[in-house]
Amino acid sequence: MAAFGIKSKIFQIMEMTILFLFAISIDRYCFAADEDMLQDVCVADLHSKVKVNGFPCKTNFTAADFSSFAISKPGATNNKFGSKVTTANVEQVPGLNTLGVSLARIDYAPGGINPPHTHPRASEMVFVMEGELDVGFITTANVLVSKQITKGEVFVFPRGLVHFQKNNGKIPAAVVSAFNSQLPGTQSIPITLFGASPTVPDDVLAQTFQINIEDVQQIKSKFAPAKKF
């Protein structure tokens, strides 16, 4: 009986330890989008052949690795969407590696749109520098949360939710976006579905959107994958 009691206590301790470790892991993922930094700086070696979740550290770095004019000028908006996203993430600012933050600038022509998209690795906060925008995100319960925002205003898009911005004004608009990830990633819904390479099967898209295959092919022609040379 004594031996049984000892074993029972051991199992109780093991259960408590497992639950404690599980709680820690849940807490970690609730508050962090990227892995925590383990050293003062880890400037990304963007040319390394080593593949890790992130980028390996460069041996030598300078102040230039922590600085960039990437978003200092408006982006060209003469395209099919009338908008341009210019990023300042770890790929432009190697010093952001392991820091869990990045920025982007988005410029919109009058009538321009940043079409529905998601950021799988980050939440986003936009600050309106010029103009006004109709913005919104859609919850997993298919509820649209939308608002018109103007110069000086901020708006938050939760991580992973589909969202958009549309300039319905008569003048250009611009925002700065902040992310809690060094590389938030972007999936544009129309481009992802109709411009993937290899292409998503026509019958899949036809049944999904309840349209015929000819319509699918017509839409795909507008989002043809870019040729790789």
Curated annotation (Swiss-Prot):
Disulfide topology: 42-57
Secretion signal span: 1-32
Glycan-carrying positions: 60
Subcellular location: Secreted, Extracellular space, Apoplast
Keyword Methyltransferase: no
Entry GO CC: apoplast
Enzyme Commission (EC) number: 1.15.1.1
Top-level taxon of the source organism: Eukaryota
Every Cupin type-1 domain range: 69-217
Temperature remarks: Highly thermostable.
PROSITE patterns (UniProt xref): GERMIN (PS00725)
Key word Repressor present: no
Family the entry assigns: Belongs to the germin family.
Quaternary assembly: Monomer. In the absence of manganese, it forms tetrameric and pentameric forms which show superoxide dismutase activity.
Function: May interact with bacterial adhesins thereby protecting the reproductive tissues from microbial attack. Has no oxalate oxidase activity.
Protein name per the record: Nectarin-1
Native organism: Nicotiana plumbaginifolia
Gene field: NEC1
